Amino acid sequence: TPMTTRVLFDFAQQLTLLDQHELAVQFLDRTVAQGGDNHSTAYFRGNAMKFMGRMDEAEAAFEHSIALKPDYSHAHWALAFLGRKTGAEQRVERLRALLQRTTAADADRCYLDYALYRELEMLGDDEGAWQSLERGFQAKRRSVQHDAAAETALFDQIIARFPTVPRAFSTTDDAATPIFIVGMPRTGTTLLERILGNSLSITLCGELNDLRMQYKWATDNYCPGFFDEKSLARAGDADYAELGRRYLDHVKWRAPGSRR
C-alpha cells in the first residue's frame, strides 16, 4: 500500500531531525509527487537544502513556501537568515506590508520581526534592525509563559532528589563510551564538541533527546520538558543501570566503529 502524503512528510521531518537531509529530500519529493506540495513541504525542503549547502535551492524552496502561504512566518525568517543581500530591499517591503496587515499570534509574528531585523541589518540600517529585533523579542516574551519561581522550585527538587550520582554500570568492551558536554547556551559547548570531533575515535552526534526520552521510559511518565514533579517523584524507583543500557542501545547506530 503506498504511503500517504502525511506519512511521507512525517518521515521527512524525522529524517531531518536525524540530520539525514539527503534522504529527507527524497521523501519530500515523493510527498510532492503524490500531491503534497504545500508551504510546509517547501519549508522543510528549504531547510534540508540549507544544511546540505545548496543555498540557491534553499532560497527557491523558501520562496515557494511563501508563494503558497504568504503569511508563513517561519519561511520568511528562514529566507532572511540565509544571509543573501540580493533581493533584500524587496523582501523588506514585503515584510513591512505583511507586518502591517497580519493578525498572527505573537508566537508567529515574532519571526516576521526577526526576519525584518536580519534583512535591515544586511542593508546597513542598524537602527531599523534594532527596532525590529526589539519588537520581535517583546512579541516572543508575550508568548512565553515562563514561571521563574516554579523553575527554581523544580531545580531545588532535583538537587534534593539526587544528592549523589547513581552508581555507574560496566559496559561491554565493544560499546562506545558517550561523552556528555554540559553547559548553558553560548558558553562554548559547540566549539568544544568540534574540537573533540577532530579525533578519529570520536563521532559527533549533536544535541540528542535520547537520554531525556529514556528517563521518561524509566519513570513511566511523559512530560514536555526533561523533568516535572511527577517524574521526579518517581526518580527513586527508576532502574538507572537499565536506563543507561537502553540509552547506549538507542544511540550506538550513530557511532559505528567509534570508541566515543
Question: What is the meaning of each model-derived region?
Answer:
Residues 15, 49, 82-83, 113, ...:
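Residue at a conserved register position within TPR or TPR-like alpha-solenoid repeats
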Residues 169-260:
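Phosphate-binding active sites in nucleotide-utilizing proteins
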